[in-house]
Swiss-Prot record:
Region entry Disordered, spans: 198-221
Annotated gene: rnhB
Annotated RNase H type-2 domain residues: 29-220
High-level lineage: Bacteria, Bacillati, Cyanobacteriota, Cyanophyceae, Synechococcales
Protein name: Ribonuclease HII
Domain of life assignment: Bacteria
Top EC class for this record: hydrolase
Organism from which the protein derives: Synechococcus sp. (strain JA-3-3Ab) (Cyanobacteria bacterium Yellowstone A-Prime)
Binding site for a divalent metal cation: 35-36, 129
């Protein structure tokens, strides 16, 4: 059933297999946690990941997995590698800046999620961070702050974050001056000042307000 958005956690907590376990007890084995990163960035793609963990996994196998925002880059890199070893399936999907401009950020995020899910094969149920997305079908449970509650959603957040950060940092050489090695496309003051100085690159989201303001000659630091 489509979840209505339950949950809500602020402090640093260890995600659990509570939600996955309930579905496993119903006989489902291919439960995919899905999360996205990069939704609010000014440049680069929005990226989603889908992670299917083995039924009845010992949570100690992924004991350090948290919402990606609660981990430092070396920790994220370590756990992304460990997730790849432990998971039954991992899928990564992205939607480019051009697709974001063409579709809008919501539809592009949905597209990235659909692309990630297409890589993991059969999915019996989706655990989704945030609010329900009817386009993903009826077999989903949406959890507010799900990346802090569900281990598979937290795992997806890490996989997506590491993949996107690595891409943006590699583009720092191709598109120098914007500071992507550190800001990975987000709208820091350094990035906004670089936009004033250099103008947008092909990887910038021209439909986003700061870029629209730039085209109108109004962007500021």
């Amino acid at each position: 059933m489509v979840g209505s958005g339950v949950g809500g956690v602020d402090k640093v907590v260890q995600p659990s297999l509570k939600w996955e376990g309930s579905l496993w007890q119903q006989g489902m084995r291919r439960v995919a946690g899905v999360d996205e990163v990069g939704r609010g960035a000014l440049a680069g793609p929005v990226v989603a990941a889908a992670v299917i963990l083995p039924a009845h996994l010992d949570p100690e196998a992924l004991s350090g997995v948290r919402d990606c925002k609660q981990l430092r880059p070396p920790q994220r890199a370590h756990w992304a590698e460990r997730i790849a070893q432990v998971a039954l399936a991992v899928g990564i999907g992205s939607a480019s800046a051009a697709e974001i401009d063409q579709l809008n950020i919501r539809q592009a995020t949905l597209l990235a999620m659909q692309r990630a899910l297409a890589q993991v094969g059969e999915v019996e149920h989706i655990l989704l961070d945030g609010l329900p997305l009817a386009e993903l079908g009826s077999r989903q449970t949406a959890l507010v702050k799900g990346d802090q509650l569900s281990l598979s959603i937290a795992a997806a957040s890490i996989v997506a974050k590491v993949w996107r950060d690595t891409l943006m940092q590699s583009w720092d050489h191709q598109y120098p001056g914007y500071g992507w090695r550190t800001n990975v496309g987000y709208g820091t003051q350094e990035h906004r000042l670089a936009l004033q100085r250099l103008g947008p690159s092909p990887q910038h989201r021209r439909s986003f307000a700061p870029l629209r303001d730039l085209q109108a000659g109004e962007i500021g630091g």
